[in-house]
């Protein structure tokens, strides 16, 4: 009986630790390609967000100003997939991150560069 209680406490601890670490894990986004020739698109993918929830995408221009915040909806796995149109973008490096208001978390900041010169893609 004593061993059963100890086992129950251990199992409860492991489950609680797993639940806490799953809740505190920050969402992650990636962009592809990281350097793109204007006017071709950039693909953004994200994981680790609250499932079936609204998230807020932020995109900062090379001059430090931000585009209008874009609201997106995650799938049942907490994933997002979005194509970024570069047609109105000037050359330079852009910063992208996504907020998850429900979980009160923010993704990493991903960067991509828009260029008008095809030679820049060879570097």
Residue ranges of predicted features:
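Bacterial N-terminal signal peptides that target proteins for export
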Residues: 1-11
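Extracytoplasmic/secretory-pathway segments with low complexity and glycosylation-like composition
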Residues: 20-123
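Hydrophobic h-region of N-terminal signal peptides that target proteins for export
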Residues: 12-20
